[in-house]
C-alpha cells in the first residue's frame, strides 16, 4: 500500500516511502495453535462471565444507556482522535499512521471483560459495551478512518473486515446469552462457573502475553511503533476514566469504561491489516498490533494489581477500626449506578448523593463498610 502526501500540510513531515523490514517466519504452527486455543478460551470465558450477568440489570443498561453512550464516545471518539494525534506527533510514515488509526478505530476486546471482573467493575456494563461497540464498529470504523485519513491520498482502498466483525459479534453474543440463561435457571451453579471463568481469563491473559513475546522475538522492530504501542493503551485508560468521571459516572463505571477504552480488539485489527496492506508492509504492522496487545495486557495487570493493593489496604483499615468484626461481615458491594438514573427506575439501585462529587466518594466508600453493628 502506498500513499502520496505531496502538497499535503497535514501529513507527517518524514512521510517517505521505504521498504519495511522483512522476516516473520517459522511461526505458522504457533499462530495456528494460538488462534484455535484463544478462540476456545474466549468462548468459555465469555460464557462464564455471562453467568455473572442478570437480565434485569442488562435491560436497565439498555433502557437507560448512559454508561454505554459514554463508553462508545470514548471508544470511537477519544481513541481514534488519540491515534491521529500520536501519528502526527511522532511523524509516522503514512502506512504506519494508518495502522495506528486502524487500532484506534477498533471496538473493545474480550480482554477488557477479564480485567473488569478483576477490578470489581460493572460486568453488565462491560459486556454491554463490548457487544454494542462491536455492532457499532460496522459503521464507526469506516467513518473514523474516512475522517482521519482524508489528509492522505491513498492509492489502495482500506478494507473493513465485516466478516470478522460478524464472527466476533456471534462469539460474544452466543456465549454471553447462554451464561445469562444459566444464571437465571441455576444461580448456584453459575457462581461456580464464574470462578472457573476468572481462572480461565487469567490463563488467557498469560497465553496472549507469552505468545506476543514469542512472535515478536527476532523481528526487525520499528522503535517508534513500539513506543506508541506502549503509551496508546495508557492514554486510552486515562482519557476513558476522565470522561466517565466528568459525566458523573460512579467509580465502578469509571473503572469499567477506563478498561474498555484502552483494551482494543487485536484480532479484528490484524484481520483489517491483512486485508488492506501488501506483504511487504504487513510484517511491521503486525508487529505493532501484537505489541499493542502485549502492552494492553501488561498495563491491565498493573491496574488490577494497583486496585487489589488498594482494596487490601482499605480492608486492613476497616479491620483496625472494627477489630471485633469477622472477615465475612463486609457487605456485598452495592450496585453503583449512574447519576443520570432516576430514583424510580429500580428500587434495588443504590442511589448516590445529590452532588456528583459526593456521589463518587460515597459509592466508593460504601463498598468497604462492614456490616457488623
Curated annotation (Swiss-Prot):
GO BP of this protein: lipid transport; sodium ion transport; sodium-dependent organic anion transport
Stretches for region Disordered: 1-21
Keywords in alphabetical order: Glycoprotein, Ion transport, Lipid transport, Membrane, Sodium, Sodium transport, Symport, Transmembrane, Transmembrane helix, Transport
Entries under Pfam families matching the protein: SBF
Signal peptide residues on this chain, from the entry's feature table: none
Protein modification: Glycosylated.
Subcellular location: Membrane
Top-rank taxon: Eukaryota
Disruption phenotype: Knockout mice have normal reproductive phenotype, however, males show higher cholesterol sulfate serum levels than wild-type.
UniProt key word Transmembrane: yes
Gene Ontology MF term list: sodium-dependent organic anion transmembrane transporter activity; symporter activity
Glycosites: 8, 14
Expression across tissues: Highest expression in lung and testis, moderate expression in heart, bladder and skin, and low expression in blood, liver, stomach, small intestine, spleen, kidney, adrenal gland, seminal vesicle, preputial gland, coagulating gland, lacrimal gland/eye, and brain.
Membrane-spanning parts: 33-53, 68-88, 98-118, 127-147, 158-178, 196-216, 225-245, 266-283, 285-305
Ranges of the Cytoplasmic topological domain: 54-67, 119-126, 179-195, 246-265, 306-373
Biased composition (Polar residues): 1-15
Catalyzed reactions: estrone 3-sulfate(out) + 2 Na(+)(out) = estrone 3-sulfate(in) + 2 Na(+)(in); 17beta-estradiol 3-sulfate(out) + 2 Na(+)(out) = 17beta-estradiol 3-sulfate(in) + 2 Na(+)(in); dehydroepiandrosterone 3-sulfate(out) + 2 Na(+)(out) = dehydroepiandrosterone 3-sulfate(in) + 2 Na(+)(in); androst-5-ene-diol 3-sulfate(out) + 2 Na(+)(out) = androst-5-ene-diol 3-sulfate(in) + 2 Na(+)(in)
Disulfide bond residue pairs: none
Other information: In humans, 3-beta-sulfooxy-androst-5-en-17-one (DHEAS) is the most abundant circulating steroid sulfate in the human body, it is mainly synthesized from adrenal glands and gonads, whereas rats and mice have low circulating concentrations of DHEAS in the periphery as they can only produce DHEAS in their gonads.
Protein purpose: Transports sulfoconjugated steroid hormones from the extracellular compartment into the cytosol in a sodium-dependent manner without hydrolysis. Steroid sulfate hormones are commonly considered to be biologically inactive metabolites, that may be activated by steroid sulfatases into free steroids. May play an important role by delivering sulfoconjugated steroids to specific target cells in reproductive organs. May play a role transporting the estriol precursor 16alpha-hydroxydehydroepiandrosterone 3-sulfate (16a-OH-DHEAS) at the fetal blood vessel endothelium.
Name listed for the protein in its UniProt record: Sodium-dependent organic anion transporter
Source organism of the structure: Mus musculus
Lineage: Eukaryota, Metazoa, Chordata, Craniata, Vertebrata
Gene label: Slc10a6
Amino acid at each position: 500500500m502506498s500513499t502520496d502526501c505531496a502538497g499535503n500540510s497535514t501529513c507527517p513531515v518524514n512521510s517517505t516511502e521505504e521498504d519495511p523490514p522483512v522476516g516473520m517466519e517459522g511461526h505458522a504452527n504457533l499462530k495456528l495453535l494460538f488462534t484455535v486455543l484463544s478462540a476456545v478460551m474466549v468462548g468459555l470465558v465469555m460464557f462464564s462471565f455471562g453467568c455473572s450477568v442478570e437480565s434485569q440489570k442488562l435491560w436497565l443498561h439498555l433502557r437507560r444507556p448512559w454508561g454505554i453512550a459514554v463508553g462508545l464516545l470514548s471508544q470511537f471518539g477519544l481513541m481514534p482522535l488519540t491515534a491521529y494525534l500520536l501519528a502526527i506527533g511522532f511523524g509516522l510514515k503514512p502506512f504506519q499512521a494508518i495502522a495506528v488509526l486502524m487500532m484506534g478505530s477498533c471496538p473493545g476486546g474480550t480482554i477488557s471483560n477479564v480485567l473488569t471482573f478483576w477490578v470489581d467493575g460493572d460486568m453488565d456494563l462491560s459486556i454491554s459495551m463490548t457487544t454494542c461497540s462491536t455492532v457499532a464498529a460496522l459503521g464507526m470504523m469506516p467513518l473514523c478512518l474516512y475522517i482521519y485519513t482524508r489528509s492522505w491520498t491513498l492509492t489502495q482502498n482500506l478494507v473493513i473486515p465485516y466478516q470478522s466483525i460478524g464472527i466476533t459479534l456471534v462469539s460474544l453474543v452466543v456465549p454471553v446469552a447462554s451464561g445469562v440463561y444459566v444464571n437465571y435457571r441455576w444461580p448456584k451453579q453459575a457462581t461456580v462457573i464464574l470462578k472457573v471463568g476468572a481462572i480461565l481469563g487469567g490463563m488467557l491473559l498469560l497465553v496472549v502475553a507469552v505468545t506476543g513475546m514469542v512472535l515478536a522475538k527476532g523481528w526487525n522492530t520499528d522503535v517508534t511503533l513500539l513506543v506508541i504501542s506502549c503509551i496508546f493503551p495508557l492514554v486510552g485508560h486515562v482519557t476513558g476514566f476522565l470522561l466517565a468521571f466528568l459525566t458523573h459516572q460512579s467509580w465502578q463505571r469509571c473503572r469499567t469504561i477506563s478498561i474498555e477504552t484502552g483494551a482494543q480488539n487485536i484480532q479484528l485489527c490484524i484481520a483489517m491489516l491483512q486485508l488492506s496492506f501488501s506483504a511487504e508492509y504487513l510484517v511491521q504492522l503486525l508487529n505493532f498490533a501484537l505489541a499493542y496487545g502485549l502492552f494492553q495486557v501488561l498495563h491491565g495487570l498493573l491496574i488490577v494489581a494497583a486496585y487489589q493493593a488498594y482494596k487490601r489496604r482499605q480492608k486492613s483499615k476497616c479491620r483496625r477500626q472494627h477489630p471485633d468484626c469477622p472477615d465475612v461481615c463486609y457487605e456485598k458491594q452495592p450496585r453503583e449506578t449512574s447519576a443520570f438514573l432516576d430514583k424510580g427506575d429500580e428500587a434495588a439501585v443504590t442511589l448516590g448523593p445529590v452532588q456528583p462529587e459526593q456521589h463518587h466518594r460515597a459509592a466508593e466508600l460504601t463498598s468497604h463498610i462492614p456490616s457488623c453493628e
